[in-house]
Amino acid sequence: MKKTLSFIALFGLAFVFAQTAANLTEFKENIAKQKVEAKKALKPFRYDGSKVTYFNFKTYKQVKEVEIYLFNNTDYRFSFNGKSLPNDVTIKIYDKDKTVSDRILLKEVSGVKGQNLVVESSDLNKVYQSKKSGSSRLKRVFVDYEIPGVPGSQNKKPTMKERGAVILVMGYKN
């Protein structure tokens, strides 16, 4: 009897582990496909790089920040893919990082879930120059992903349904 129960418990654990591994593999495969899709949205700009930001939805609000350098007065295009999001997030783009109190909000986008969005640095520069007179072009921008709290989330052991990612692909004008 003990051997039978041990076998059933071991089999059940193996099944749960295999299911989780399969879900994670599927999640990463979807991200790879969505990265290709985001890369296509860069045209006619040339691909420069990408950054996938992974996170788990929790019961409290979170902010993840990514810094992007802008070189040599070059125009850039940023493609954000939010098709790996089970819940919506807000993207805010600033001129300085989140530790600086007088930073300028250059662009805010909500409704990212299920979308592929494009933002150009030329538009960000126009906003920056209009809000800060006498300034030159931006040398870098900070992308903040505001992740809302989701009631009922598992903070300690999140499920695959609470896992999300935003794919950011960057390109420059040639």
State where each predicted segment sits.
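Bacterial Sec-dependent N-terminal signal peptides
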Residues: 1-24
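Acidic, Ser/Thr/Pro-rich low-complexity intrinsically disordered segments
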Residues: 20-21, 56-174
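Alpha-helical structural elements
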Residues: 10-12, 40-42, 49-50, 71, ...
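Non-catalytic extracellular/lumenal accessory regions of secreted precursors
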Residues: 20-64, 172-174
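Short linear sequence elements within intrinsically disordered, low-complexity coil regions
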Residues: 12, 16, 50-52, 81, ...
